[in-house]
Amino acid sequence: MTSYSISVSVKGTNINKYPGKQHARRVAARLAKQKGLIYLPGQQTVLSEDSDQARPFKQRRYFFYVTGVVEPDCHVTYDIAEDKLTLYVPDFDFKRTIWTGPTLGKDDAKQRYDVDAVEYYSSLEGDVQRWAQGNPSTPIYILHPDQKPVTPLTVAYLYESKSLQHAMDACRVIKDEHESEAQIAGLFIDVCLSLRSRGTAYQTIAASGPNGATLHYTRNNEPLAGRQMVVLDAGAEWDCYASDVTRSFPIPSSVSGKENSGKGDWPSREAEEVYAIVQRMQEESISRVREGAMFFSIHQHAHSIALDELLRLGILRIPHGSSKADLVKAEATALFFPHGLGHHLGLEVHDVAPDSGTVPVTSSSSSSSSRVTAVTAQCQDGLMSVTEHRPPCTLSAPPLAAGMVITVEPGIYFNRLAIDQARAERDKPGSKGRFVDFDVVERYMAVGGVRIEDDVLVTKDGSRNLTDAPKGQDMLDMIYDRC
């Protein structure tokens, strides 16, 4: 049996430990407070309804960010003034140990995690009370009002639930060296599952033929026979971090009667043409990712490629009396590319995004306001589509910063429902359907959809593609065993 190992080194004294203390300090600095107590609960064991069996465990991401702990029933506090990170683990329960095995113990936790102290949960209430009594006018920072530490005197304490999440979101969006190398690189299926991945980061999408035009198709229960393409959107979860990768590839059995010598690898000319468009959209988009770039502008560039290519194929058209600007204003490309170019990636597959202005200004991002003004002007002039999506595909999103991890996932889709609706509305002024040649579109319907998605780390001087799953010609060579 082939074995795999991943060894991660982190600058500092806590080699191979998740940098929870470093993250706690970063959050405190973002809060800009000299004193205070941060409290975060981990995910507690929850039984399924009417059952004595626990639901599948998934750690709370904010708790994990400052601890690195992937165990249930834990809590953490961070004393800002004392720079002390304390982890609370479940009290020893002999019966539970017999039935389900030992829970995380104090000595084991101190050895495994980057914390200053480890206590049993039974100490939490008293510790919080003593801290509050010694700091009567200093707040205890919590994420939500319903996450106060369990204590009979909660109403007497000064809780603050407005600042912590904003501070943590601003910190989480910047990935440090440990996160980028240990949590994202090498996440994909063969290595992750052979190690200790807890499973996928989201429901796998395996959509063949027309199902590939449904963005989040998860039924995954239809046969491949007679279909041209498969969209496989799948990502592993590793120590609470998500990957998000998509590949679209031809079904080999659909390439019938062809000699696979590097030519004729596609089930149809239409499938090959659509794939080439999406590949160009992605390659040019990734080349524009760098610190200081406005992702919304990159998203719009991908749309401009789609527009030119769909016009070239005759899928889009400019009717008599109309102009290309009219086509852009109608957002006709959104009929075939209806989603944002990408999203933040981290502890969640659709990770948190910073509020506008919360990412530190750098020399490369200091002109972000002027860039937003320029992009806005282009939208108003009809040179770009103006539809916004999930951050960072918004005009108000701050510029990309080094350390962010984003997905870049353009796609072209031929969704029957959307196409039929556009056809029904094509006589309406300003409608998308006015700019579509539906006879040409019918030739492409069997393709379904094509999406290519990589996970990209923003760096000071550009970007680093963290995804090494093959695509393009390398993908075809692997499919047809030419590697």
From Swiss-Prot:
Known EC number: 3.4.11.9
Transmembrane annotation, as ranges: none
Similarity-based family: Belongs to the peptidase M24B family.
Name of protein: Probable Xaa-Pro aminopeptidase MCYG_06503
Gene3D superfamilies in alphabetical order: Creatinase/methionine aminopeptidase superfamily
Organism: Arthroderma otae (strain ATCC MYA-4605 / CBS 113480) (Microsporum canis)
Keywords: Aminopeptidase, Hydrolase, Manganese, Metal-binding, Metalloprotease, Protease
Disulfide bonds: none
Molecular-function GO terms, alphabetical: manganese ion binding; metalloaminopeptidase activity
Cofactors demanded by this protein: Mn(2+)
Cofactor-binding details, from the entry: Binds 2 manganese ions per subunit.
BP term (GO), one: proteolysis
Highest taxon above the source species: Eukaryota
Positions annotated to bind Mn(2+) 1: D244, E409, E453
UniProt-annotated binding residues for Mn(2+) 2: D233, D244, E453
Catalytic activity: Release of any N-terminal amino acid, including proline, that is linked to proline, even from a dipeptide or tripeptide
Record's function text: Catalyzes the removal of a penultimate prolyl residue from the N-termini of peptides.
